[in-house]
Amino acid sequence: VIPTQQLSKTMNVLHDSFFLSENNVLNVFVCGVGTVGAQLLEQIQQQYSTLLTQQHLQLNVVGIANSRTAIFDPEGLELSNYREQLKQQERCGDGFSIKQAALQMANLYNSVFVDCTASAEVSSIYLSLLENNISVVTANKIAASSEYDHYIKLKQTALDRGVKFLFETNVGAGLPIIGTINDLRNSGDKILRIEAVLSGTLNFIFNEIAADVPFSETIR
């Protein structure tokens, strides 16, 4: 039995199964267009042709949101002028809900929500997205550092729905720490203990002191 709200997505999946394209399509909604989000969108635009020809990956940015409004096109947005599109949408918009905006992807196959904010409001919609079969990739640390039960629920929902909940950049300044630990566990290793200086600031200070830089100069 297929829920009515999942009918369109199901038809898209069946269509792809019977009429396979040579390219895999990934539909992406980027929330946050500050330093991180803007760089991500620029990289996607620059690498679009390379990903398509070398990886057979058609990466469509179908949605972009800032703190005030969002733009959405299921066929893919033009990234060269997305800031102007956001301004135009902001001028004519009558209210804005990031949850409603992101859930427009619910009927798109292979849909991914990318959170480049530090917003508690945005992180609060992850569960709804995962329940609607939308993967979540986040640089926002709030959800993964929230109550443990909520964190486990997010991971379990992603597993049950066959989608991804990824947060690699939450720790280690973007180093592949979480992925490495997962690979070790998946290959049968048992993690007994992890020792680390978890503060990036302290790591910087220690490195400077080790290079004989005076403490007073290091923290200046």
Language model segments and positions:
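N-terminal glycine-/serine-/threonine-rich beta1-alpha1-beta2 phosphate-ribose binding loop
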Residues: 27-33, 37-131
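Rossmann-fold NAD(P)-binding glycine/threonine-rich loop
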Residues: 119-132, 141-184
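Short acidic, glycine/serine/threonine-rich loops at helix termini
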Residues: 2, 39-43, 72-79, 148-151, ...
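General beta-strand structural signal in soluble alpha/beta enzymes
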Residues: 112-115, 136-139, 165-169, 193-196
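Short, ordered loop/turn segments at secondary-structure junctions
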Residues: 33, 66-69, 141-144, 170-172, ...
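Conserved anion/nucleotide-ligand pocket segment
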Residues: 180-220
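A conserved regulatory-domain signal marking ACT and ACT-like small-molecule sensing domains
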Residues: 1-40
